[in-house]
């Protein structure tokens, strides 16, 4: 059996895996256990009451967290004309059409989000094999294919998170950094849960939000008592 590291022993001793923690208690515990030499992200896993094998029960979308994610986001926009100027004014780092596609084909991908206006999809469509595996392919379901590229850039810069359930019906995303105030992390979490509730498939039956867990980049998961969250009502 592998020997536990000192960090793992501390986590094992501090975290009760059978307990559902009040959100404030959970955040305090995560902060205490976040001892990495960098500012760890606070990640959330939400178990949904869906059948992920059925396409009409899959959950996908995006929402802007009220306090952002604490990450600096670099944005590439495929568009032209007035939209190109609007995207630049909104703060996009990369704006173009075929010229931007050529950069990507050369392996130059210094961005975190790709946005496209509908007329640019003829160019973006050629990049599926490069952007798709990295989760960067623009999609109207998450607001990254839109005629209003400036708004999409603003959302990305403001702390928009995209979510999509995995094959087990679990949503994984981030809600901030461990150095955020507890209230900000709670409000970001509640904002995400509100968005997930709005995205509930009509075919999903029974309890929808089954379990909510928080963790830091290098830490263990802490199960959250949903009764302490304003956003949750199954």
Swiss-Prot record:
Keywords in alphabetical order: Repressor, Ribonucleoprotein, Ribosomal protein, RNA-binding, rRNA-binding, Translation regulation, tRNA-binding
PROSITE patterns (UniProt xref): RIBOSOMAL_L1 (PS01199)
GO terms, molecular function: rRNA binding; structural constituent of ribosome; tRNA binding
InterPro entries named in the record: Ribosom_uL1_bac-type (IPR005878), Ribosomal_uL1 (IPR002143), Ribosomal_uL1-like (IPR023674), Ribosomal_uL1/biogenesis (IPR028364), Ribosomal_uL1_3-a/b-sand (IPR016095), Ribosomal_uL1_CS (IPR023673)
Pfam families per UniProt: Ribosomal_L1
GO-annotated biological processes: regulation of translation; translation
Domain of life: Bacteria
RNA-binding listed as a keyword: yes
Keyword Cell cycle in record: no
Transmembrane feature ranges: none
Gene Ontology cellular component terms for the protein in this record: cytosolic large ribosomal subunit
Gene3D superfamilies assigned: 3.30.190.20, 3.40.50.790
Function: Binds directly to 23S rRNA. The L1 stalk is quite mobile in the ribosome, and is involved in E site tRNA release. Protein L1 is also a translational repressor protein, it controls the translation of the L11 operon by binding to its mRNA.
Quaternary structure and partners: Part of the 50S ribosomal subunit.
Entry-linked PANTHER family: 54S RIBOSOMAL PROTEIN L1, MITOCHONDRIAL (PTHR36427), LARGE RIBOSOMAL SUBUNIT PROTEIN UL1M (PTHR36427:SF3)
Family assignment from sequence similarity: Belongs to the universal ribosomal protein uL1 family.
Full protein name: Large ribosomal subunit protein uL1
